Amino acid sequence: MARFDYSNQVTGKDIARGRVNEAPISPKHAIEIAGFIRGMKLDDAAAYLEGVVALQKPIPFKRFNRNVPHRKGLVGWDAGRYPQKASRVYLRLLNNVRKNAEYNGLEGDQLRIVHVSANRGIRRRSFMPRAMGRATPKDRQTVNIELVVREQEA
């Protein structure tokens, strides 16, 4: 069996980590969300992603932005989307990291995201039913996400 390790070796007693393996979400959406929440406070990132799930706040698409329309409310960028499914996975991960931090004795309101990465996972083979009893093969993409937070001094 393969062993997983974090790509960024952040060490110290003031960090907490979390990881999601093989999440069935779009890799492009996961990469854009990772680039957006990197460097944010944990509570601010969670509040913003809840707004994305409610279709109130868009995520700016800076890399995968071909044929992506403009969104009202984006500052410093014009193209954006509302990746709800990926945002729900990130919210679960942020909640997991917050609980890991509390278990390690860190304060939840002073946590800042220092590392987040989204990498393509394995492809799961599936089949899409077609007419006349045929089936078309289709690959389902997965994503591996890792997140590290550090307690910041007030």
Curated annotation (Swiss-Prot):
GO terms for molecular function: rRNA binding; structural constituent of ribosome. This is Large ribosomal subunit protein uL22. Belongs to the universal ribosomal protein uL22 family. It comes from the Archaea. Pfam families: Ribosomal_L22. Keywords: Ribonucleoprotein, Ribosomal protein, RNA-binding, rRNA-binding. PROSITE patterns: RIBOSOMAL_L22. Part of the 50S ribosomal subunit. InterPro entries: Ribosomal_uL22, Ribosomal_uL22_CS, Ribosomal_uL22_euk/arc, Ribosomal_uL22_sf. NCBIfam families: PRK04223.1, uL22_arch_euk. The keyword Glycoprotein does not apply. This protein binds specifically to 23S rRNA. It makes multiple contacts with different domains of the 23S rRNA in the assembled 50S subunit and ribosome. The globular domain of the protein is located near the polypeptide exit tunnel on the outside of the subunit, while an extended beta-hairpin is found that lines the wall of the exit tunnel in the center of the 70S ribosome. CDD domains: Ribosomal_L22. GO terms for biological process: cytoplasmic translation. GO terms for cellular component: cytosolic large ribosomal subunit.
